[in-house]
Amino acid sequence: MLPTILYSAILALSALTPSALAETRSSGCGKHPSLANGVIHLNGREYILKLPDRYDNNHAYHLVFGLHWRGGNMQNVANGESIQPWYGLETRAQGSTIFIAPNGKNAGWANNGGEDVAFIDAIIKQVEADLCVDQSSRFATGFSWGGGMSYSLACSRAKQFKAVSVLSGGVISGCDGGHDPIAYLGIHGINDGVLPFNGGVGLAQKFVQNNGCQQANIGAPPSGSKSSVRTDFKGCSKPVSFIAYDGGHDSAPLGVGSSLAPDATWKFFMAA
């Protein structure tokens, strides 16, 4: 009896070795994929899928959602209209990431009754059943209403997403839950006349609290300086940072050619 117990214990311990840790690998790993680049239809809605050029079905990839703004659409994100394609993240990913641009209802993310969060859930389920994804490495970013939807995911899906980057967002897609910690980056223009700067600060403060960070004053650059000031909160269980930049309600902070938001977002995601 004792040898049997010992043998079972050894098997249980062996399952915890790094080579056997498969819980973060999606069920699509090892499969020949049926999904391909382009527009995917799902439950009466649609999204754009972009795979790495050399997709390997045995390699677990990061998964990044790029969410469009009010009046925008998934093509704006994928093609780079008023922003760099995929918010500038695809070039920085260098083949490490699967990108998804969902299409909002009525060119927005009202998330009535949680329908947009449910749509994101359904996309994740479909993609990860077919493709190889590191399930501990999901991210979301977006501008304006896309930022609001990213914030909503931070509230309701903090255990499913590793980090979000909210560009000029507001509480416009709801905040169901909103008590769990998640890595949170906020980027906001000090002269935003659509979703005010102080509101963006308030979004970050929720996760300062959730993540147990030490309170700190958020710095801001002088108006007209064309510069930015970053605040990294200390003592957090998961990182929280906020970048204030000299600008308004801009889909590409400091201009489409600026590396500010793409660099900050990608580095934050990878360090989260």
UniProtKB/Swiss-Prot annotation:
Signal peptide feature range: 1-22
Domain of life: Eukaryota
Compartment(s): Secreted
Record EC number: 3.1.1.73
UniProt KW keywords: Carbohydrate metabolism, Hydrolase, Polysaccharide degradation, Secreted, Signal, Xylan degradation
Reactions catalysed: feruloyl-polysaccharide + H2O = ferulate + polysaccharide
GO MF, any single term: feruloyl esterase activity
An individual GO BP term: xylan catabolic process
GO cellular component terms given for this protein: extracellular region
Chain ranges passing through the membrane: none
Functional description taken from the UniProt entry: Involved in degradation of plant cell walls. Hydrolyzes the feruloyl-arabinose ester bond in arabinoxylans, and the feruloyl-galactose ester bond in pectin. Active against paranitrophenyl-acetate, methyl ferulate and wheat arabinoxylan.
Assigned protein family: Belongs to the faeC family.
Protein name: Probable feruloyl esterase C
Species annotation: Aspergillus clavatus (strain ATCC 1007 / CBS 513.65 / DSM 816 / NCTC 3887 / NRRL 1 / QM 1276 / 107)
Lineage: Eukaryota, Fungi, Dikarya, Ascomycota, Pezizomycotina
Gene (UniProt): faeC-1
